[in-house]
Amino acid sequence: MQTDTQPMSHPLIQESSQVDLDVLEAIQQRILWLAVRMVDSANNDRTADEVKVGGHQASSASLVSVMTVLWFAHIGGSDKVAVKPHASPVYHAIKYLTGELDRSYLTRLRSFGGLQAYPSRTKDPDVADFSTGSMGLGVVAPLFAAAARRYVDAHGGPTSQEPARFIALAGDAELDEGNIWEAVTDPSLQGLGNVTWVIDTNRQSLDRVVPDQKIKKLIEFFRGAGWHVVEAKYGSLLQGEFDRPGGDILRHHIDEMPNEQYQSLFGLEGPALRARFLEHAPDGLAEFIAAWSDDQLGRTVRNLGGHDLGLLIDSFRECDSVTDRPSVVFAYTVKGWGLPIAGDPLNHAAFLTAKQIGELRSVAGLSTDTEWDRFDPATPEGRLCSAVGSNINNRPLAPRPTLPIPTSAGQAVPGKPTSSQEAFGRILTRLASIPEVGNRIVTTSPDVSVSTNLGGWINKVGVFHPDEQPDYLSDGRLLRWKQTRAGQHIELGISEMNLFMMLHALGLAHELHDEHVLPIGTVYDPFVCRGLDALIYALYNDARFVIAGTPAGVTLAPEGGAHQSSITPSIGLELPGLDYVEPAFAQPLDWLLCDGLRRLAEPDGSSLYLRLSTRPIDQTPFADCAEATDMERLRQDVLAGGYRLREPDGAPAEVVLATCGPVTPEVLGAADILADEGLASVVLDLTSPSRLYRDWRVSLRSASREARTAHPTFHLARLLPHHERGLPIVTVHDAASHHLAWLGAVFGARTVPVGVDEFGQSGTIADLYESFDLTSGQIANAALVAVS
């Protein structure tokens, strides 16, 4: 059996306008077998552990047909696909058949160093285009990747690249996730005609059958958002019966049948199946199907479009023909298709028995000696697998380019009190003028660009829009909101999840689009938590970007507790792949931002989290420190995580005051008070607590692994000479007090942590600092407690 396809949708079809569905059927059956057997092997062929290995045979089976058509009759090498998490065995089976995955991995699903439970960009040997596993995020990742590709293309990206399509495979229950709808409705993501989502509509979630009206509502949601909707609902066998005289009765009955009733048909045979199917049936339906045998009835009523290969090819072709908006295909499938557990409401975590595995092996035409074999290369199936592999399998990726990023943007040290947020905006504007750097920077913000000091940058580079827009409101305004294809700022709606997903997409532009950009996002600091799942997802994928959380802390006094962050520094310190910095002064911020942009391209680099403030701070203390210190040494200390801002005056220090961010003036004031009391102190400005901590932790881990004494080669040991390492420490931070409390453990010193351990409220900075013991007098008292 053959069907027409689009000539340019697949490597083999470039020479032929036909796809042999019999070959696809054979490949589909082998993929089903391998996916199911991989899960079976993981749970039964290894030494038993205390924890169940798990896996999803039924969820994999429901997408076998869709993925067979996509990989073997639709996508090409430039296309990117996000695989439904629970279908990861299907993905690995495809990568094995096409030659990318070594056979040894098939028995290492969910094992250390083997195949991950869910598709992973960073952990799997057959690198996935998008990691999936955190529900909802993998679904929208291709949508944001398409937006990033649109941006790259508009800014002179590689002209040799073929056009790319971005596809997501999602379960129908996954559409419960709210971040999906935040993305679907965002104006910046409209008009992406190279995006297709395929919804695995098997009507089952983890615990239950999906309620009846849900799918209809979802379809209307997509249509209301301007998406093109395709329903691959009924297979050709069932469609043929609908076309017979009286077939409209059959269609109406199935359309109106409750999901629970329809799902129950998969567990019934013979007269019981017929009786259940005819419950609440309209007049005439019993006569319409009277001539059907029980077997024919079962084959017909279970014939859904999500398992009809020809219909799926046509559905994807239709999506390709719509180029002015995204498309979504609702592929009606059977959870557990082709397996004895098909349609069982409790099949999500069910495993086939050894007897059932043996029967499935026989259906696949295999034996225990051949069960892991690929197709013979000389067969039509083998030739197709080879051709697909040569076109779509991953190739080595060139490293990110080294850019001429300076150590400083050349921002003059302000002569007046300046906030770190204000300095950030000025530094960014100066970076725009640096060749090969400014043109690669792209900023994005969830409708807070002006209030996070991106106004100067936007005036200089403009706002990105795929089609130039008229500007009716800029006359006489300080902010010029000019929207063109050349703009370098992407404005999002008020969604922090979308912000981090956009940063994720831009931060992988080199890997996905062969173009390295420098993404910088801004967000109100307390709402870093609101987008935390997407932030973690981006870092897990090794996306590289800069995020500025500003304004931060109770220093944002008038805004009240809802806008005053306290735990975000802990997030910055504890997340892998993220360097958290909180400079108090403008020059260290300049150094840190330039260094952070440089690290985005390094193989072992990281993303950068700037925690900033709107509080103007006198820059004189840093200028005095710089005058008394070698400037390059000072810069290196700042980048390493901290420097000695003030030395004890005359007498040896008796206490260490460690701080960062906007409370630094209060700490310096406390040092003055202590000096008047005859107590000398050293003040450390910790520009990056996360770098300090990790440096110390690496030293300890290395020593513990080698069973030796840890040598004090970490940066904090360089900041505190031997005679100061046992001194009491007072840590002061506009954040949760525990965030810096670990400092005392480094050298076994008595520690008094001062910080924000309750929710704030509206007031002045003086009010809030008094409330949280952040005034100079209270900090001095804490130092007296520490030394007492």
Per-region residue spans from a language model:
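Acidic, glycine-rich active-site loops and adjacent beta-strand->loop/helix elements
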Residues: P85-V90, A170-E177, D200-S205, G235-L237, ...
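Non-catalytic terminal/interface segments that mediate subunit docking, oligomerization
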Residues: Q28-W33, D79-K80, T379, R383-A543, ...
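Residue-level marker for buried hydrophobic side chains located in beta-strands
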Residues: A168-L169, W197, T444, I547, ...
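Cofactor-binding active-site loop characterized by glycine-rich and histidine/acidic residues
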Residues: V19-I31, A35-R46, S59-Q190, P211, ...
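Thiamine diphosphate
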Residues: S111-A128, L137, Y151, H155, ...
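Glycine-rich phosphate/pyrophosphate-binding loops
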Residues: S78-D79, R150-S160, L508-F527, F545, ...
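Glycine- and acidic
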Residues: S16-L24, N43-G54, G76-D79, D124-T132, ...
